[in-house]
C-alpha cells in the first residue's frame, strides 16, 4: 500500500531508525518498523481484514476516532491511520477494505488512555 505521513515530525520519527528509537524507545521502535513495513508491503488493507489480522489486530475505530483505523504496536499503543478510499459504495466490508490501497498515518497513541 501507499503510505503518506503528512505530519513532518511524525514522518521523520517513523522513517528514520535513530529518530524512531529516540522518540519511542528501542522495543516500540522495532515494532513500529515491523508494522510500517507490513502495511507498505500489503496489496490492500484487506491483507489485514480482522479474521486474518494476526498480531496487528487491525480494526476501525469508533466514537471520536470514527473513520480511522488502528493496528497494535505495543500495548497500549496503536498506529492510527485514515484510509484513502476511491469510491463510496461497496457490497460488503471486505470489498471496501480491498479497495483501500493508500493510507494516511495520523499518529501513534494510547487510544484508551
Which residues are covered by each model-predicted region?
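Enriched for short, Lys/Arg-rich terminal
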Residues: 69-113
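Residue-level preference for alpha-helix termini and adjacent loops
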Residues: 2-4, 23, 47, 57-60, ...
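A short, surface-exposed loop/turn module that caps and links secondary-structure elements
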Residues: 44-67
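Arg/Lys-rich, positively charged N-terminal/basic patches that mediate binding to nucleic acids
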Residues: 1-37
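Charge-dense, helix-prone N-terminal extensions
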Residues: 6, 12, 25-27, 56, ...
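Short connector loops at helix/strand junctions that flank enzyme active sites
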Residues: 34, 56, 64-66, 74-76, ...
Amino acid at each position: 500500500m501507499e503510505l503518506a505521513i503528512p505530519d513532518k515530525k511524525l514522518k521523520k520519527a517513523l522513517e528514520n531508525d535513530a529518530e524512531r528509537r529516540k522518540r519511542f524507545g528501542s522495543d516500540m521502535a522495532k515494532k513500529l518498523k515491523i508494522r510500517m513495513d507490513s502495511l507498505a508491503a500489503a496489496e490492500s488493507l484487506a491483507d489485514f481484514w480482522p479474521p486474518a489480522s494476526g498480531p496487528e489486530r487491525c480494526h476501525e475505530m469508533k466514537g471520536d476516532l470514527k473513520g480511522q483505523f488502528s493496528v497494535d504496536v505495543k500495548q497500549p499503543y496503536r498506529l492510527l491511520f485514515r484510509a484513502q478510499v476511491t469510491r463510496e459504495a461497496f457490497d460488503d466490508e471486505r470489498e471496501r477494505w480491498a479497495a483501500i490501497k493508500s493510507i494516511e498515518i495520523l499518529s501513534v497513541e494510547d487510544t484508551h488512555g
